[in-house]
């Protein structure tokens, strides 16, 4: 499941601490019931319900929440003092809510090593859930990977190797140029997700090729920078967009999955969760999933996890921790084996996900291989801004960087305007 991008988190973060709590109906007490809320699909929730019902010693109740209205419902529950004992949250939500004092600090529970062990989380995943002071206000759960879905027939026709672990940025750009030459009327690389052409995507290119990241540290940054390698990466991408070799940052990728599954494009950028949608469309060609390209200096792969958070006024942290710990291993192993949506940041909980993929076809196995590779790579880049200025920074990117990358404004001027605009927000 992709991370939640709803802006209603701002409504939640603006509430006073007094408005947050488990509530008498939702709060778990010793021997009572622990409540939680997800944004997952009906099928995934049903699979999770079956597994969570097996937990002994404490009751578990999932609160209903329509996927599309999740953030709004969460805000309403906090306002009415009926927030569940734990709830699905994105990394950016967690950082913003924690900054307002609205979340429970799980640091002491993780330190005990009872239920979950710190060294069993995938590299770097826990660090993004700690605030600048090192407190842990959320536990990472479902991990997203991002990469390139490819149509093998199109690559074979153009006499190109299919993308695979270890391919490079130079190969990516050479491939889409060759694919464009083979079929001038088509756009070879289509974005079903905006990350590739975002500042973070360009930052990944920069770091992989020996440059600096756009933010020095993912949490607690007070400025962004765009060095010469970042600008060189942006220039390469802008040229590819102008040549019609890839879609622009504002492209609406709503129909991209269906088009890819029907053989309408050689390459589609997106997350591993699109696997199920592609499969449901029953493609009649060989396809697979490859990770981000390597640069001249290193391979840098994305790190992004969703997680669970609890209200600061949590009534029963002992039993809540017990439920979360059970879910991270048994709950997710059983659920993801039935509904293979994502690997789990807590590595012992990913067994079911990988078993489901390895039992599938070659495409499913390629997704398993890419997910394993991306999660295990040491060098990572963060897929979004996480600091409190992150939401308005998105507006700055949309009016400065995106038009410049699309060729509507001078590129370096657009980058400079983005840097200046975000740094002004970060300085407040």
Q: Where would I find each of the regions flagged by the language model?
A:
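Glycine-centered hinge/linker elements that transmit conformational signals in sensory
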Residues: 175-176, 219-249
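Conserved N-terminal structural module of periplasmic/extracytoplasmic solute-binding proteins
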Residues: 2-100, 112-118, 162, 283, ...
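Extracytoplasmic/periplasmic solute-binding protein
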Residues: 132-141, 146, 170-222, 229, ...
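Extracytoplasmic/periplasmic substrate-binding proteins
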Residues: 201-208, 235-319
């Amino acid at each position: 499941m992709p991370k939640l991008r709803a802006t209603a988190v701002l409504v939640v973060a603006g509430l006073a601490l007094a408005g947050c709590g488990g509530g008498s109906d939702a709060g778990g007490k010793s021997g009572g019931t622990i409540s939680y809320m997800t944004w997952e699909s009906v099928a995934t929730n049903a699979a999770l319900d079956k597994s969570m019902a097996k937990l002994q010693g404490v009751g578990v109740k999932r609160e209903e929440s329509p996927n599309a209205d999740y953030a709004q419902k969460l805000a309403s529950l906090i306002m009415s003092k009926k927030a569940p004992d734990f709830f699905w949250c994105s990394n950016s939500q967690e950082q913003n809510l924690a900054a307002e004092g609205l979340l429970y600090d799980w640091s002491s529970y993780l330190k005990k090593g009872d239920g979950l062990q710190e060294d069993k989380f995938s590299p770097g995943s826990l660090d993004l859930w700690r605030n600048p002071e090192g407190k842990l206000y959320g536990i990472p759960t479902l991990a997203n990977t991002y990469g390139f879905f490819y149509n093998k027939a199109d690559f074979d026709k153009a006499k190109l190797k299919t993308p695979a672990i270890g391919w490079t940025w130079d190969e990516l750009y050479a491939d889409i140029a060759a694919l464009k030459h083979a079929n001038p009327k088509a756009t070879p690389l289509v974005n079903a997700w905006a990350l590739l052409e975002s500042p973070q995507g360009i930052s990944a290119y920069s770091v992989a090729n020996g440059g600096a990241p756009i933010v020095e540290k993912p949490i607690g940054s007070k400025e962004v920078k765009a060095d010469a390698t970042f600008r060189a990466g942006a220039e390469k991408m802008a040229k590819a967009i102008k040549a019609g070799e890839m879609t622009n940052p504002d492209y609406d990728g709503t129909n991209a999955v269906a088009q890819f599954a029907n053989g309408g494009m050689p390459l589609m950028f997106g997350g591993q969760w699109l696997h199920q949608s592609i499969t449901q469309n029953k493609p009649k060609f060989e396809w697979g999933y490859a990770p981000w390209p390597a640069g001249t200096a290193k391979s840098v792969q994305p790190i992004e996890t969703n997680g669970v958070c609890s209200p600061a006024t949590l009534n029963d942290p002992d039993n809540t921790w017990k439920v979360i710990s059970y879910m991270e291993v048994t709950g997710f192993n059983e659920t993801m084996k039935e509904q293979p949506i994502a690997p789990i940041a807590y590595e012992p909980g990913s067994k079911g996900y990988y078993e489901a993929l390895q039992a599938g076809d070659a495409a499913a196995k390629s997704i398993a291989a890419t997910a394993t590779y991306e999660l295990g790579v040491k060098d990572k880049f963060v897929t979004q801004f996480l600091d409190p200025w992150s939401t308005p920074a998105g507006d700055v990117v949309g009016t400065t960087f995106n038009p410049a990358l699309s060729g509507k404004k001078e590129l370096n001027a657009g980058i400079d305007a983005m840097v200046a605009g975000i740094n002004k927000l970060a300085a407040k």
